[in-house]
């Protein structure tokens, strides 16, 4: 009798293992296809899928394959595992920068031998925390874009405290620009007041650069993907940010008068989002500085466990990107992005002549 019971139990266990193993495998394979298509299509309606990084989905998919492998033995498991690994390596934002180098090479000490070298930093100040601006200034930047910025008075007091008369400041309510040289503030539409700070910067050598610090609409953080309302909210927020960015970039382009342009800030969107497609469509040939020369992990949020890259610096064709990195901070929930740019000699000379 006991032997019969054991036999039935083993039979039931075998059936359970078979169907559960195939269930895990089908879910993993289907998820792989869905994530791949979501990356290709980048449609607003599926924007919720583009918030977690590709490697996070890869870990889920590979975990399902591993669980399936304990239950059933099939070559399809290996095929789906290889598909997940290939998907992650090819599509993950981190793969490209890690291929250039495992560790950042940009140092705190700036090369001062070239007068056309410009160091740019963008950082979210985490609720107007002045200490993060102090951190940024230790890198001797020529330009700092801040979001959730300290007030103009607080920034001016910091410069007086440091007895640094090279810098000027514009903005300071949500976005601000701190730069060496002469800043001339630009007026943006009132609807963008809480999302931008724009200025033209005249460098000591007379070159003029158009600058913009931006902070797009806050993202939602809900992850209940089984709830239709979650997808709707992500969809609407993504559309709001796209409208903001298009309006901001259109205004920036109209104000620049063909000057060299640098803009950056907190985009509040995963780099897998279709939000960033607006930049080449409106601005043309612009370079994401970390994409061009960054090494190591470029993710900026959160500071202590960076899983997504939402803070960026972009430069026009007038600049060459020397180096870039994402740097851990002590006083913000974001990491700061630091980039060294070289204003091309021809462009510098042309603007001096004009």
Task: Report residues per predicted region.
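Active-site beta-strand/loop signature of hydrolases that rely on acidic residues for catalysis
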Residues: 32, 49, 119-125, 132-156, ...
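Metal-dependent phosphoester-hydrolase catalytic domains
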Residues: 6-78, 200, 253-261, 267-354
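Short, solvent-exposed loop/turn segments at secondary-structure junctions
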Residues: 126-128, 151, 183, 216-219, ...
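Catalytic-adjacent loop/helix segments of enzymes that bind and process anionic phosphate/sulfate esters
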Residues: 186-252, 348-354
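Transmembrane alpha-helices and immediately adjacent membrane-cytoplasm interface residues
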Residues: 59-107
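Short extracytoplasmic/periplasmic juxtamembrane "stem" segments immediately C-terminal to an N-terminal membrane anchor
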Residues: 105-127
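Structural motif corresponding to alpha-helix initiation and N-cap regions
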Residues: 129-130, 307
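Structured beta-strand-rich core segments of catalytic domains in phosphoester-bond hydrolases
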Residues: 89-109, 131, 143, 147-220, ...
């Amino acid at each position: 009798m006991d032997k019969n019971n054991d036999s039935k139990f083993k039979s039931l266990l075998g059936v359970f293992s078979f169907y559960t193993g195939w269930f895990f495998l089908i879910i993993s394979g289907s998820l792989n296809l869905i994530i791949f298509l979501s990356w290709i299509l980048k449609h607003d309606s599926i924007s919720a899928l583009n918030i977690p990084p590709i490697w996070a989905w890869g870990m889920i998919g590979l975990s399902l394959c591993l669980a399936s492998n304990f239950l059933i033995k099939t070559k399809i498991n290996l095929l789906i595992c290889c598909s997940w690994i290939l998907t992650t390596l090819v599509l993950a934002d981190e793969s490209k920068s890690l291929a250039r180098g495992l560790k950042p090479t940009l140092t705190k000490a700036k090369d001062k031998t070239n007068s056309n070298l410009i160091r740019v930093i963008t950082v979210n100040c985490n609720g107007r925390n002045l200490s993060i601006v102090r951190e940024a200034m230790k890198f001797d930047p020529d330009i700092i874009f801040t979001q959730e910025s300290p007030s103009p008075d607080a920034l001016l007091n910091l410069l007086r405290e440091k007895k640094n008369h090279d810098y000027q400041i514009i903005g300071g309510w949500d976005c601000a620009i701190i730069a060496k040289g002469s800043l001339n503030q630009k007026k943006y539409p009132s609807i963008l007041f809480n999302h931008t700070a724009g200025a033209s910067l005249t460098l000591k050598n007379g070159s003029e650069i158009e600058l913009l610090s931006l902070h797009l609409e806050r993202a939602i953080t809900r992850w209940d993907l089984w709830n239709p309302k979650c997808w709707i909210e992500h969809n609407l927020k993504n559309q709001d940010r796209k409208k903001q960015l298009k309006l901001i970039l259109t205004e920036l382009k109209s104000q620049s008068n063909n000057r060299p342009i640098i803009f950056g800030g907190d985009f509040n969107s995963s780099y897998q989002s279709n939000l960033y497609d607006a930049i080449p469509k409106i601005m043309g040939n612009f370079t994401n500085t970390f994409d061009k020369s960054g090494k190591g992990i470029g993710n900026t949020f959160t500071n202590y466990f960076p899983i997504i890259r939402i803070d960026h610096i972009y430069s026009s064709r007038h600049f060459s990107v020397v180096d870039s990195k994402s740097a851990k901070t002590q006083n913000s929930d974001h990491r700061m992005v630091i980039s060294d740019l070289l204003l091309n000699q021809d462009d510098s000379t042309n603007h001096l002549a004009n």
